[in-house]
Swiss-Prot record:
<keyword id="KW-0430">Lectin</keyword>
<feature type="domain" description="Jacalin-type lectin">
    <location>
        <begin position="8"/>
        <end position="190"/>
    </location>
</feature>
<protein>
    <recommendedName>
        <fullName>Jacalin-related lectin 25</fullName>
    </recommendedName>
</protein>
<dbReference type="InterPro" id="IPR001229">
    <property type="entry name" value="Jacalin-like_lectin_dom"/>
</dbReference>
<dbReference type="InterPro" id="IPR036404">
    <property type="entry name" value="Jacalin-like_lectin_dom_sf"/>
</dbReference>
<comment type="similarity">
    <text>Belongs to the jacalin lectin family.</text>
</comment>
<dbReference type="Pfam" id="PF01419">
    <property type="entry name" value="Jacalin"/>
</dbReference>
<dbReference type="GO" id="GO:0030246">
    <property type="term" value="F:carbohydrate binding"/>
</dbReference>
Amino acid sequence: MKSRGREMFKVGPIGSQRAYLKNLEWEEKGRNMISSIYVAFDKDTINSIQFSYCQNGGHVVSKKYGMSDAQKQKYGSYNGRFHVMFVFALVTDDHVKTNLCNIQVRLNDDEFVTGLSAIYLCKGITNLNIHTNQGKHGPICDRYSSSKNIMDNYKVEIDVKIRDRREFGGFFGSFDNYGTLTSIGIYVCPITRINDVALRTNYKVTDDYDDQSTFYQSSGPLTTINHNRKLEYQMPHEVSDVKPIVHNPNFEDKISLYQSSDRLARSTNTRTLEYQIPEFLDVNPIGRKSKLKYGIFSKLARLFRNLLD
């Protein structure tokens, strides 16, 4: 996986370039799916480094940085010793295979680089450790582990708290013209996580122009603003802390025509009146009583009076 479209920056390096020698700078950046790291070394220094990546279901090998075997046999080292590469295999654990002067650090599929540590002295980088999310590989070219004084005073570690594979951007460093690794560092490619919060607020964005209060005011934050100035939303974990906004109407509830012992109308949050159906047990209707039977007899009486007349 390549780190495209994201800015990377250097962290380190451990060590430095030598002003009195020709320095060969190198870098291997932009890919974070490292499957193996190959390192060649003698008893004093690290002489070359190479990387293998997972790509499209296969493996791609990078350029080999440092002095090649042919160059070492031709020119030797700066102190006059030749670099002889042995081929006797020694298996130390499930991740590392050693040929005495050649080492392969093999990473698991879900493993990625998080940092480095090493010792830098006048002869170059030694005691190199590759730190990952699953542990540590090394030390490579272990010369000073038994010296507490050197370990305490000259060991340098790069740890930028990488927690995501995408944050690792690659390696960089330098070799001198004798094939000695004089410096090494890493590239970091920051990404924004939801939990990387610079500011929290109790407001929720409802449109593109105005930030409005949420209808339910919660005691926990509903919105977070990340480093890209984009809003990320969090759902409330508990409903019990939600307090609804209740509207108190400014007008009085009117009593209906039927006089009941209970209130028949009540106000709601939407400023409307809701009426309850009255129970007629205690209702006294307003109006005259029916005079139907008295009207019939009066008509009959008038009829008889007319007949008699």
